Amino acid sequence: MNTYINRINQPSPQSKALLLLLSLAASPVMADDTRTDSEQTFDNCVLRQIHMDVEQDSLEKIKAQCEQEKTAGRAKTTTRHELEKETAENPFVITPYRQNYLLPITHMKSVNKNPYNSEVFGDAADGLSDEEIKFQISFKVPLITDDIFNESDELYFGFTLKSFWQAYSSDISAPFRDTNYRPEVFYETKLPIEAGDGLWFSRVGYEHESNGRTDELSRSWNRIYAGVGYEEDNFMMYVEPWYNLGGMDSDNTDIEDYLGHYELTTAYKYDVLEFTGVGHYNFRTGYGGLEAGVSFPLLEHVRGYVQYFNGYGESLIDFDYHNQRIGVGILLTDII
């Protein structure tokens, strides 16, 4: 008799499935179609437990177990990645790619006058100043975000503009000494690597870089790349080897000698400071360049920024010229 009563009191697998589905439907997660990856992890876990039909697990135990999986799934992302996901479908939001900054005051050890020494430019090179304005604008646009090969991959168009403005050289009409344009298309996906608490990712893409000039001042090249990186909320490292496809100009065929075959990007947050570094190097020639920076709070949406560069390849016009520069200004978006 007791056995019969226990069987009556114990919910059947079908009853448990109904209870779990009702509980899931009543949760705030189901009320929003724009769920995060961690919320989807929770939903999938509950449905998986229903499919397994484990009669000994109570509703509370299953939800507790799935909450742990949800927390673990949340750890494999970053604040920046979550914010980008939230605004990906907003047509009024431009997603930053690389750093966006303005350095109104920069000083070089010695400005590169070599490209302007021909008779075409006369004595214009004499008017170039060691002080100039440097700024960078960089953004990316998602082209495909829906399950290309897996649930976490995306295809982007990226564009970066970096400019060097001789604003203080009034004697030669304050020209833009060089402006570099970097359009690219790249595929990005998360990697199933469990090492660390952050997110492993990979990028594969094609990039064209040019200064938009003609004749003697023209510089450009094309490359394909495949990089791998690791990111947490306070740390990021990304290495991007590339293969040079060549350029349309015959005057920078040796660009690899100075820019190398890869780029390494790192960032680290310490309290309110963020330290960044971007470098490239050619192990055969011994040439390379390093850009190091530190940002700090200044205004609500603007950070102060100090940047230092040493080496070759700060710009395309200077790819084979060794330069040192220090600059101060503002930073709109950082790396992490």
Regions found by a protein language model. Give the residues of each.
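N-terminal signal peptide c-region/cleavage motif recognized by signal peptidases
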Residues: 26-28
